[in-house]
Design a protein with these regions (language model features):
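Short, compact, well-ordered microdomains
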Residues: 60-100
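N-terminal "domain-start" segment
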Residues: 1-70
Length: 100
C-alpha cells in the first residue's frame, strides 16, 4: 500500500525538516504489523528532544520515539495517507492534519 510514489504538500516540504520527513517514511516502511491506509504522527518536543508518537487504527498500533535534534523540536500532527490512482497504482501523501 505504501510501495508507490511518495508525495508531500508544499507546507510539509517547507516546514518539516527533511530529516523528519525521511524518518516518518521509514517508520511506515518498518512497521511490524499490516499497514493501515492512514498513518498518524503526533510530534512534540521536550527541551532539545523530538518526540514522535506513531499510530494507526487497523490493526491497532502505537510506538513512541524520542531523540535529540539539532533544531527546535517540531510540534504538529501529520497524516500519511495511502491511496490508488486511476490506474490502480499505489501512492502516498504526507500532509499536516489541518491540510486534510
Amino acid at each position: 500500500m505504501f510501495s508507490g510514489n511518495r508525495y508531500l504538500t508544499k507546507r510539509i516540504h517547507k516546514e518539516l525538516p527533511l530529516f523528519l520527513q525521511l524518518l516518518l517514511w521509514n517508520c511506515i516502511a518498518e512497521l511490524p504489523v499490516p499497514k493501515d491506509y492512514l498513518q498518524i504522527f503526533r510530534l512534540s518536543g521536550a527541551g532539545s528532544q523530538q518526540i514522535i508518537l506513531h499510530s494507526q487504527e487497523v490493526p491497532p498500533y502505537e510506538k513512541r520515539y524520542q531523540f535529540a535534534v539539532p533544531f527546535s523540536p517540531v510540534t504538529a500532527k501529520i497524516y500519511v495517507i495511502a491511496e490508488y490512482d486511476a490506474n490502480q497504482k499505489p501512492y502516498a501523501t504526507m500532509l499536516f492534519a489541518e491540510e486534510y
